[in-house]
Regions:
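Peptidoglycan-targeting cell-wall enzymes and recognition modules
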Residues: 3-30, 37, 56-140
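Mid-sequence acidic-hydrophobic segments that form the walls
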Residues: 112-116, 151-155, 171
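Extracellular cell-wall/glycan-interacting regions and their flexible linkers
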Residues: 1-49, 68, 155-208
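A charged, solvent-exposed segment within the mature domains of Sec-exported extracytoplasmic proteins
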Residues: 140-147, 154
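C-terminal binding/interaction regions
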Residues: 131-133, 145, 149
Length: 208
């Protein structure tokens, strides 16, 4: 399954997780599989998803509402990197990634939050104060959505974020990531090395 996207600065999808359309549910499934396969708890994964729903309605090519497509001075993407050039130029430009692919945006969260291209994104003003503790926390999805908003997004808090996180937690609870990494499913780890500015960057994808 690949990510769905609409390259737009208009609101075309809903911010209410419970009212998500099939394209959004597909993207939510991709996000759930991505973070769960990397060891994030169900609650932390849902918290990240709840914030993304509020920021972009789970559209990886969402430009900031009221802006225009291509405006790199305002927000862009699943978590509305602001300005957009932070994601587009610094990250995609460095590694040669497709800006519309939600996979690489999730990869940014997973690999760039601590010690990434911009240093540390997680500021730890509320518990869990460390990124590693957040990733495995089994606090409620709603409480972790608040922690992600304050420590990572650093944006305005809305109970919509909590409600979305709780919804996605209940929706996916107990469903293992696909493909699984428990040894029962045969998987092949595909690794591509990309040489950028003298460094090798390893990109991991799992396939059945």
């Amino acid at each position: 399954m690949s990510w769905n996207y609409i390259d737009t600065a208009s609101q075309v999808w809903t911010h209410d997780a419970a009212s998500s359309n099939s394209l959004q549910i597909d993207n939510a499934t991709e996000m759930w599989n991505f973070f769960r396969a990397r060891g994030y708890s169900e609650q932390a994964t849902a918290a990240i998803m709840g914030n993304a729903q509020q920021e972009s309605a789970l559209n990886p090519a969402q430009w900031q509402y009221g802006s225009y497509v291509g405006n790199r001075n305002l927000g862009y993407g699943l978590w509305q990197w602001d300005p957009a050039e932070r994601y587009w130029d610094l990250y995609c430009g460095t590694y040669g990634y497709d800006r519309t692919d939600g996979y690489y945006q999730c990869l940014w969260v997973d690999t760039q939050t601590i010690g990434g291209l911009e240093g540390n994104q997680w500021i730890g003003v509320v518990a869990p104060t460390s990124w590693e503790a957040f990733k495995v926390s089994e606090n409620s999805a709603g409480d972790l959505a608040y922690a992600f908003c304050r420590n990572w997004e650093r944006g305005n808090w809305s109970e919509v974020r909590r409600n979305n996180a709780t919804y996605w937690y209940n929706y996916f609870h107990g469903i293992p990531p696909t493909p699984t990494m428990d040894g029962n499913t045969l998987v092949t780890l595909y690794i591509s090395a990309k040489k950028r500015k003298g460094n090798f960057i390893f990109e991991e994808r799992w396939y059945k």
